[in-house]
Amino acid sequence: MVRHFRPCYMSWVLTVNRFLTRLALCAWLSCLSSLGCSDPVSSAGAPAPPSSTPGCRAPAGVSDAPRTIDETVALINALPKPLSLPCFLESLARPLQVHASYSVFSAQPAQGARSPRIFLFQDPTVMSIVPEGEGASLLEFGEQRPEFRSLKAEIVFPVAAALDPSAPFDKLMFDSQITTCGGCHAGELQESEISGVRRFVSRALRPQPGDRVSVQSLDHELAICDRSLEPQRCAMLDGLLGWGSVTERDFPVGMATFGG
């Protein structure tokens, strides 16, 4: 009897390619230097948000301000399925604090200043999104730990059914010992295990200050976004910016930057 291993082989190839891509990005990052920081801008004076999209609100008893990866899974599981990433963003309590960066040196790269990588602060967790391109289907996490380390995780959208607690971690493994995050985030160590899936912490990194994109610029991109041409990108920007106050926030200055 001939056994066909092609599906497993292709899955392994994709995992290896993903890890090598992250590793290659880190090599580029090592050549970069720190730039200046722009002044923070706030959209706190924006008009009142419109009525919420049906279903894109946390039901009673479920927090719409998740502070941990586990609490985020609980919110996702409480929202209607299939759940889009824009709907999840809309469901989050306002005000939101964000930091946007146009750097392409990431496994979730920005598509220029018009579609930057956007970090959302839900202390002690930092989530990240990008409105278009590679990584636009991902919600990435860094749940902060002492000494500028963080627990890494990611969730792929749309979410079709309730997630297991281990779901944010089970796609990150490169092999039995390290994750795909370990190529860029040094000092990776196992912190715990859940449902047989290992969870790893590693060095937390912040974007280069000079790559910052202001909230004012993001608001402008939402205002001019053509929904007939870029429906998903417009939906992502609207999910983030269209439902209440969004303000800028800095990362801790003691945290290392991408590229040193």
Per-region residue spans from a language model:
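Short stretches within intrinsically disordered, low-complexity N-terminal or propeptide regions
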Residues: 4, 26-29, 46-50
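Short, intrinsically disordered, low-complexity terminal segments
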Residues: 21-24, 41-45, 55-57, 75
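Extracytoplasmic c-type cytochrome modules immediately beyond a signal peptide or single-pass transmembrane anchor
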Residues: 49-176, 199-260
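Short Cys/His-rich "knuckle" micro-motifs
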Residues: 191-196
